UniProtKB/Swiss-Prot annotation:
Name of the featured protein: Aspartate carbamoyltransferase catalytic subunit
Keyword line: Pyrimidine biosynthesis, Transferase
Pfam families the record matches: OTCace (PF00185), OTCace_N (PF02729)
Upper lineage: Bacteria, Pseudomonadati, Pseudomonadota, Gammaproteobacteria, Legionellales
Function in brief: Catalyzes the condensation of carbamoyl phosphate and aspartate to form carbamoyl aspartate and inorganic phosphate, the committed step in the de novo pyrimidine nucleotide biosynthesis pathway.
GO biological process, alphabetically ordered: 'de novo' pyrimidine nucleobase biosynthetic process; 'de novo' UMP biosynthetic process; amino acid metabolic process
Amino acid sequence: MNELPLHLLNMRSLTRDHIEKLIQRANYFLTQGMEKNSVFETLKGHVVVNLFFEPSTRTRNSFEIAAKRLGAMVLNPNLKISAISKGETLFDTIKTLEAMGVYFFIVRHSENETPEQIAKQLSSGVVINAGDGNHQHPSQALIDLMTIKQHKPHWNKLCVTIIGDIRHSRVANSLMDGLVTMGVPEIRLVGPSSLLPDKVGNDSIKKFTELKPSLLNSDVIVTLRLQKERHDNSVDIDAFRGSFRLTPEKLYSAKPDAIVMHPGPVNREVEINSDVADNQQSVILQQVRNGVAMRMAVLELFLLRDFRFF
């Protein structure tokens, strides 16, 4: 196995073996930890800080629950009343928290590569990228890969279709990287041309501007919301809804046992119809549940740095 990176900043730093072992460990935490309400002591005595400069429900709360289930102390500073609001630089804040004994820095920021810049400032400790701009969101990709494998265990036979605002989606970037690493042979990106990336960088990735053809023979369908905060409001929401909203009629074009995913937050009746979001093919809430277990596995691995302890 290749050496584990010091920080979790992007998906390309993880090998297939890293990802498989993380999924295995997360499934353990799901069955032996969460379902039994167990608390572990792996992170006992360690301090985790959630530094979220953008809104979050699922990611921030699941990291907090994950850290507490591993025995850590968790800080959730109100950044609006922190010293940053008085003019202190972000990096001085980081060094201050490090001096207080914080070991894990869970960082979400609107600017690309801010977590990487923070990692360069640390003498010790670990930075986990919880989403930076439209760049990367590695823990969400790991959750999505875990969820896919629970239903579709053979990576080399999968067709995964990702629908929506892919150009501005850090979730899509990380998921594509992860799917390529796992050897998925067919990855389809679907949306209006203005919301698709200019380049895809891998032969397994194809672009579509019509929904129904992209769904043929799909095993996994991932819907994404419009990232309105990351671009101007030039997207015609009604036109997007009419062409790219996943409805029961359109879902019929996919395989009968296809699963439907969404990383959240869901904008119902825009990218996905409620009848699809709530039907038996939807695994959206399973993704949320898996989120705590996978983030437990991530925190444990980046502390112990060795799968032999698993």
